[in-house]
């Protein structure tokens, strides 16, 4: 059974962290970066979330250009998984595909549409940053 930590980013820069397992975690499996998920999966009824990235149990980031959920070694000029320090620098990095699988441990998401209640009201006035 899969379990994830879902980090939901708000427009104002606030991040909320949720532990998701069981049936709610199954809503994320098979989804790819850029797809939307119902906010009920993390306890935000009426909200819609877009998957923006994530990482696996080894800390490898999800890369939107890699299909599937497998790992791949790519020659990167910058972006996800590598920040060059010199102009023209390239490096081979191992990244995870864009699809959420049971190997995924953290999922990053952003809010696409809001529900009736604010997040603070749904969480009881606390933010889990």
Swiss-Prot record:
UniProt GO BP: translation
Keyword Ribonucleoprotein: yes
GO cellular component: ribonucleoprotein complex; ribosome
Keywords, sorted A to Z: Ribonucleoprotein, Ribosomal protein
InterPro entries listed in its UniProt record: Ribosomal_eS6, Ribosomal_eS6_arc, Ribosomal_eS6_CS
A Pfam match: Ribosomal_S6e
Keyword Lipid biosynthesis on entry: no
Chain intervals for the UniProt region annotation (Disordered): 106-129
A single GO molecular function term of this UniProt record: structural constituent of ribosome
Record family assignment: Belongs to the eukaryotic ribosomal protein eS6 family.
Name this protein carries in UniProt: Small ribosomal subunit protein eS6
Native source species: Natronomonas pharaonis (strain ATCC 35678 / DSM 2160 / CIP 103997 / JCM 8858 / NBRC 14720 / NCIMB 2260 / Gabara)
